[in-house]
Amino acid sequence: MARQKIRIRLKAFDHRVLDQSSQKIVDTARRTGAVVSGPIPLPTEKNIFTILRSPHVNKDSREQFEMRTHKRLIDILEPTPKTVDALMRLDLPAGVDIEIKL
């Protein structure tokens, strides 16, 4: 029989909220008897936006803004039905994007 695996990818702009959420997921999975691999930090995605400072002239005067997206990966090996139920009931902050693959 093939081993089951749940792969959870977390994304957030604030790395502190992301680390707290990933720790909650790992603690919940371990409490229900599943084997957990992670959280594994993935490369941070950095979007840079460059805009002109003035509305009309002075092309040389520009301002740059950046938006960083932090990511984590958690693998739950050999999940039990109790693990899946506990993860569905878990309450996480609003700033964290969760992607789950079975």
Swiss-Prot record:
SMART domains: Ribosomal_S10. Keywords: Ribonucleoprotein, Ribosomal protein. It holds the Pfam family Ribosomal_S10. It comes from the Bacteria. One of its GO terms (molecular function) is structural constituent of ribosome. One of its GO terms (biological process) is translation. PROSITE patterns: RIBOSOMAL_S10. GO terms for cellular component: ribonucleoprotein complex; ribosome. Belongs to the universal ribosomal protein uS10 family. Part of the 30S ribosomal subunit. Involved in the binding of tRNA to the ribosomes. PANTHER family: 30S RIBOSOMAL PROTEIN S10 FAMILY MEMBER (PTHR11700). This is Small ribosomal subunit protein uS10. It comes from Moorella thermoacetica (strain ATCC 39073 / JCM 9320). The lineage of its organism: Bacteria, Bacillati, Bacillota, Clostridia, Moorellales.
